[in-house]
Amino acid sequence: MSTSAVITGTGLYTPPEAISNEELVASFNAWVDLHNEAHADEIANGSIEAKTHSSAEFIEKASGIKSRYVINKAGILDPHRMVPDIPERPNTDSSVMCEIACLAANQAI
């Protein structure tokens, strides 16, 4: 008779940081302002349309989402970046997804 390990529970990784719709909209609207300022001439001559501001109410109505958990909140909310700042890792290091999977598996055990 052989013995094998079985994970009988479930684990769910939840990132430690969260972004509210209000925070996301403030960042997005700052990006809109930067974009419109940088492209003022093209907007004025009609070659491109100006971007418009969003609102927390619009996001909630369109998606039903009030807040989201994220990795690297600062990078996402930076209007010059608007994406997580996750440094590239060498192939000898575990990936971010691997770390998340291990954290979830440890919760399940």
Predicted regions and their residues:
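Conserved "HGTGT" condensation-loop signature of ketosynthase/thiolase-family condensing enzymes
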Residues: 1-109
